[in-house]
Regions:
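Helix-to-loop junction immediately C-terminal to a conserved catalytic motif
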Residues: 71
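Short coil-to-helix segment of the ABC ATPase nucleotide-binding domain corresponding to the Q-loop/switch region
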Residues: 116-123
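Conserved ABC ATPase signature
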Residues: 156-160, 164
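A short, proline-enriched helix->beta-strand linker immediately N-terminal to the Walker B motif
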Residues: 175-179
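Catalytic Walker B motif of ABC-type/P-loop ATPase nucleotide-binding domains
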Residues: 181-184
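Conserved ABC transporter NBD signature motif
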Residues: 79-87, 139
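ABC ATPase NBD coupling module
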Residues: 34, 88-104, 133, 205-207, ...
Length: 272
């Protein structure tokens, strides 16, 4: 992969992220599933433009519930969820497709169409929002070059490795350059070496100005990327920390140290 783009100075990033309406806001949000299981309980958080945020915590803590609420796959039981100032509970059904055009989603299991080529899988994301053929022919090769798959346009998903399939998933999510990218366990099915490449790619997308929210169990990634960490437990936010670790009291491994070098990140979360 080509070197990561030069990152803005920290003070420029702070000004960019603190100005204007948050990209994501949860205001005292609770979600109770049928049967009484509590997915989230009185969760409040704000995520600014251009931030990179990890959602961490044990299985069932509420990470995926947050992602699904932001996609409007689920409805909150109580509270308000806003994306760029627009309330999701108050949003008419007819406006939901427009909302989803501005959100890219990367899943753990890729969710590729098995009977379509790499090119067609990515093009489909543009077809469903009504882009014309000329635009599709321009955008799809560009995004496949970005993710390192320019030679795989005509391959089918079953001809690709897991890492390559996830790159197709990322290309599909980002081909329309949405302001918000949601990633639900993006390295969950990948080995450590492949995971480095996937996180390099997501990090590179974030540095274009896209807000990135990653729900993950991947301790090594979280520890050495040192981005904002929001920890959930039993549906509640128990920690919200800038430049955080997966678990603040644990040391880092040799793999995590090498990962930090691969990503070009310095000691306090800034590029080397």
């Amino acid at each position: 992969m080509a070197p990561l783009a030069t990152r803005p100075a920290p003070e420029a990033q702070d000004a960019r992220r603190s100005s204007g309406v948050p990209v994501v806001e949860f205001d005292d949000v609770s979600k109770v599933y049928p049967g009484g299981h509590v997915g989230l309980e009185q969760v409040s958080m704000k995520i600014g433009r251009g931030e990179f945020v990890f959602l961490v915590g044990p299985t069932g803590c509420g990470k995926s519930t947050c992602i699904r609420l932001l996609m409007k796959e689920l409805e909150a039981t109580e509270g308000d969820i806003l994306i760029s100032g627009h309330s999701l509970p108050e949003m008419p059904r007819r406006k939901v497709p427009r909302l989803r055009r501005n959100i890219g989603v990367v899943f753990q299991d890729y969710k590729l169409l098995p009977n379509r080529t790499v090119y067609a899988n990515v093009a489909y994301a543009l077809e469903v929002i009504g882009e014309n053929r000329q635009t599709i022919r321009r955008k799809v090769p560009d995004i496949l070059r970005l993710v390192g798959l320019s030679t795989k346009l005509h391959n089918y998903p079953d001809e690709l490795s897991g890492g390559e399939q996830q790159r197709v998933s990322i290309a599909r999510a980002f081909v329309n350059h949405p302001p918000l990218l949601l990633c639900d366990e993006p390295t969950g099915n990948l080995d450590p070496e492949t995971s480095i490449g996937i996180m390099q790619l997501i990090y590179r997308i974030n540095r274009t100005g896209t807000t990135v929210v990653v729900a993950t169990h991947d301790k090594e990634m979280v520890d050495k990327m040192r981005r904002r960490v929001i920890e959930l437990r039993e549906g509640r936010v128990i920690r919200d920390q800038q430049s955080g670790l997966y678990r603040p009291d644990e040391s880092t491994s040799e793999f995590a140290v090498r990962l930090r070098g691969e990503l070009g990140i310095g000691v306090e979360g800034h590029p080397n």
